[in-house]
């Protein structure tokens, strides 16, 4: 029994720590005079090119087309712009923990693209190379990031700090979004999908999925536990509401984690599965009627289901939502004071932040870039291209997105005219309205003590628990074991004869 439990615990711990990485690595030898830039990002997170002619995106202020991969385009652009050759060695990771494990085990990268909490962890551990002052020079026409980053995103990166230093000192945003439910409106009502309690709703027993990682499972669970507080008018209307919301949603006190463990065990009994990537396919196939998703994956699921004439909706729970970011950071262990590497890494960020490339990547992965484009209207035109109503449509509504593009939600230059259904579908996932933004909270980096407590909680929730096996199930297992023993014994007896 002890050996069994040890093996089970060891496996579960391996899952949590991500020491079984699934990396796709493109490692090549380069000449001494070529800058070697080692980049590591999420799988399928940069456009790979190979677009067909009918995939060309025609916008008012330009045409977007991905003939070759974004990485190859960058290498060519860098040589044409700076007269130096750079070779990008591109690797992929599946989870933040996998990336961190690789770094811990000695793998070296110059530029990586983790999520917000991992950026905070790497900042706290002093592993990041700060962005140079030149990177923030708005007078440089090639600094596409600082000239084009959304005013809203820029304020979030400036206001959030680790050890007294803002995120923006070390990180440049790439993609951002929220969490919520993708659901089948023919089965689940808008009201039912507007609360995290959907995960516990017995009406949808074994028909809903939740994410199979501790942070994305813990966030909605805390929201369920604190639902009454989060919806209380005095709390919502308080002067420092967002500060209080951030505190409540990052509560790691022992008592709340103990409660979360019990509630997650209840959720485990009600949901169809804990999943990382299969939830989208389960929605499209009809195995499940709702799935907790990151907004980008939600858009993908809605897009794919439409091809089968199945129309799914997006719901953001009324309690709150998780505001998340993926961003580019340079590693000290990779850059090592090499000015050429640092310049190439920052140029890579800028190249991806150029408006036409932003459109390419958004079109490829379905997520929302942190880039609004600044003076370049291409990104806004692309959003209108995707979601704007046709000229002859009569049933339309206005949908403001000025908070993202101009820092002012009432800016008349950034009000889309859309079909009403989009207010509950892809557009609302990619560019949520201000009421959603106001009730969003970033999950913070937890210290070692809190991490240990939370990881142990997750082991208790996700790993096989012998105490939960009923007497009837034990009898069934015993009978099965007995039958197996008889069969094996018979085979051995026959062979000996």
Where are these regions (language model features)?
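Extracytoplasmic ligand-binding site segments that recognize negatively charged/polar headgroups
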Residues: 40-54, 60-67, 117-119, 123-270, ...
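Sec-dependent signal peptide cleavage junction
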Residues: 21-33, 494-496
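Conserved C-terminal helix/tail region of periplasmic/extracytoplasmic solute-binding proteins
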Residues: 405-497
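Early extracytoplasmic/lumenal segment of secretory-pathway proteins
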Residues: 27-121, 125
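Ligand-binding "clamshell"
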Residues: 122-132, 166-168, 301-316, 392
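Extracytoplasmic/periplasmic substrate-binding proteins
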Residues: 269-338
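Mature extracytoplasmic/periplasmic domains
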Residues: 330-431
């Amino acid at each position: 029994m002890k050996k069994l439990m040890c093996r089970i615990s060891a496996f579960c711990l391996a899952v949590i720590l991500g020491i079984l990485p699934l990396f796709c690595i493109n490692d090549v030898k380069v000449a001494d005079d070529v800058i070697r830039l080692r980049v590591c990002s999420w799988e399928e997170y940069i456009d790979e090119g190979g677009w067909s002619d009918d995939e060309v995106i025609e916008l008012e202020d330009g045409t977007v087309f991905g003939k070759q991969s974004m990485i190859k385009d960058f290498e060519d652009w860098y040589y044409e712009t700076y007269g130096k050759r750079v070779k990008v060695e591109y690797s992929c990771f599946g989870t933040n923990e996998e990336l961190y494990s690789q770094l811990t085990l000695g793998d070296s990268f110059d530029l990586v693209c983790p999520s917000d909490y991992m950026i905070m962890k790497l900042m706290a551990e002093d592993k990041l190379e700060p962005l140079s002052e030149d990177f923030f020079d708005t007078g440089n026409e090639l600094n596409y990031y600082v000239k084009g980053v959304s005013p809203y995103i820029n304020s979030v990166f400036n206001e959030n700090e680790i050890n007294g230093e803002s995120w923006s000192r070390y990180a440049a945003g790439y993609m951002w979004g929220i969490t919520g439910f993708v659901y089948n409106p023919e089965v689940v009502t808008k009201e039912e999908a507007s609360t995290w309690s959907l995960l516990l709703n017995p009406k949808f027993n074994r028909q809903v999925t939740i994410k199979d990682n501790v942070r994305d499972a813990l966030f909605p669970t805390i929201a369920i536990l604190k639902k009454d507080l989060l919806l209380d008018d005095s709390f919502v209307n308080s002067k420092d509401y967002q500060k209080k919301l951030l505190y409540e949603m990052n509560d790691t006190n022992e008592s709340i984690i103990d409660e979360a463990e019990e509630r997650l065990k209840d959720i485990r009994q009600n949901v169809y599965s804990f999943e990382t990537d299969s939830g989208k396919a389960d929605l499209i196939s009809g195995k499940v009627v709702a799935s907790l998703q990151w907004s980008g994956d939600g858009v993908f699921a809605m897009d794919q289901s439409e091809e089968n004439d199945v129309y799914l909706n997006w719901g953001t729970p009324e309690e709150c939502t998780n505001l998340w970011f993926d961003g580019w950071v340079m590693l000290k262990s990779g850059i090592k004071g090499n000015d050429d590497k640092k310049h190439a890494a920052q140029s890579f960020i800028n190249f991806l932040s150029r408006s036409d490339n932003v459109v390419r990547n958004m079109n490829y992965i379905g997520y929302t870039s942190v880039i609004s484009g600044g003076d370049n209207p291409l990104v806004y035109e692309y959003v209108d291209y995707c979601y704007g109503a046709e000229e002859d449509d009569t049933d339309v509504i206005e949908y403001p997105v000025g908070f993202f593009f101009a820092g002012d939600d009432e800016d008349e230059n950034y009000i889309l005219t859309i079909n009403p259904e989009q207010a509950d579908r892809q557009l609302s996932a990619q560019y949520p309205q201000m009421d959603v933004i106001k009730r969003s909270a970033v999950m913070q980096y937890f210290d070692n003590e809190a991490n240990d407590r939370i990881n142990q909680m997750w082991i208790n929730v996700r790993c096989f628990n012998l105490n939960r096996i009923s007497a009837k199930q034990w009898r069934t297992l015993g009978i099965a074991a007995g039958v197996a023993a008889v069969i094996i014994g018979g085979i051995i007896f026959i062979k000996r004869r």
